[in-house]
Amino acid sequence: MATVCVVGSGILGLAVASCLLEKTNVNIVIISDDFPHESSHDLKYSPFFTSPWAGAHFRPFPSVTEFDQRHVEYTRATYGHFKKLAAFEPQEETSIRFLEGTDLVERGHPNFEYYSELKQGYREEIEDFVVNDWEHGFSASYKTWVLNAPFFLSYLFKKLRSNPRVTLKQGKLNTLREAFTENAAKNDQSPDLGANGYNYVFNCTGLGLQMNGGWDPACYVIRGQTLLLKVPSGPHLQKTVTHQSKEGQWTFFIPRPLSNPESPTEDYVILGGTKQEKDFDSGSPRSQDSLDILTRADRLFPELKDAKTGHFQVIQPNVGFRPSRKGGVRVEREKVPDVENSFAYHCYGAGGMGYELSFGVAFAVVDLFLDDYNQ
């Protein structure tokens, strides 16, 4: 039985490993500098391990760019997979919840016409899609999903860790080549890769670790800052809303299931956010960013404020560096030129859409592997 290697344990790495378990009989080694924990409460905060701090919801989008259509296909596949998980797995384990999503796009927004004219990719395969009246522009609602990112990572991680076909190796690779051959240069943090390395390696490293080191030059970070809020009970806990201003600014809130330790039925809410491209300056929250988010929310979502104090109850701010890529997520097979019968399967650069794309890109990249493995 072959052994394959998955490099990276964010949402894409765990989704790929989960798909490999489901669709193949191979053994799997997962190499990562950071791993989730079996308990979501044990996660240590790091802006560079972005997956635990995501808002994690799905919103459809019209096909504006060439790579949007690929993303549409991946998001629909993920949507279908999450529907199955919600139907057959306990919510207290996956945290997945289906509810109403709403888009609000102001007139004058750069992509207003793509939404208002319902361009390709927006409403296809979306349940309960309805166009609403809204005096300031375009509005639509639809059935969507939300989840608690730390819970869901822990759910996947526990299933992988308990499977005898899966081995976890904590360490850091300087080059992707290290995973293929014992002769590659190692560093002090390199994990033990065995005698010969691996012939099949899935590159789920966010910014795209390259064969000879460094990152994919098409990749860049988007600094995202959000706020975790305690909010009053009400119908707002049964929906997620995304507002896009005419200036192109995004403001959203997303219920985070099972997040309130005081009440399993009253969720905290993720309020966001910032999209600061190529901003690697600070992994710490910025007070001005928090103030800007709260100022917009005060106008757009006053129902989230505490009724007694008239203020937002901020539990904590979160910062994550979303690994993005020009041209969209990379889902591609690469023959390693100087290592016999060896292939890299690239799966990285999802930006702020890691959860939305997760199982769609995972199934796609595993299919690429099966084309080689079954020959």
From Swiss-Prot:
In a knockout, what does one observe?
Unable to utilize D-aspartate as a source of nitrogen.
Q: What class of enzyme is it?
A: oxidoreductase
Q: Which GO terms describe its biological process?
A: D-amino acid catabolic process; D-amino acid metabolic process; nitrogen utilization
Respond yes or no to whether keyword Flavoprotein is given for this record: yes
> What are the recorded GO MF terms, alphabetically?
D-aspartate oxidase activity; FAD binding
- Source domain of life is Eukaryota
Q: In the record, which residues are listed under signal peptide? A: 1-17
Keyword set, alphabetical order: FAD, Flavoprotein, Glycoprotein, Oxidoreductase, Signal
Q: Write down the chemical reaction(s) this protein catalyses.
A: D-aspartate + O2 + H2O = oxaloacetate + H2O2 + NH4(+); D-glutamate + O2 + H2O = H2O2 + 2-oxoglutarate + NH4(+)
Protein name per its UniProtKB record: D-aspartate oxidase
Species this protein is from:
Komagataella phaffii (strain GS115 / ATCC 20864) (Yeast)
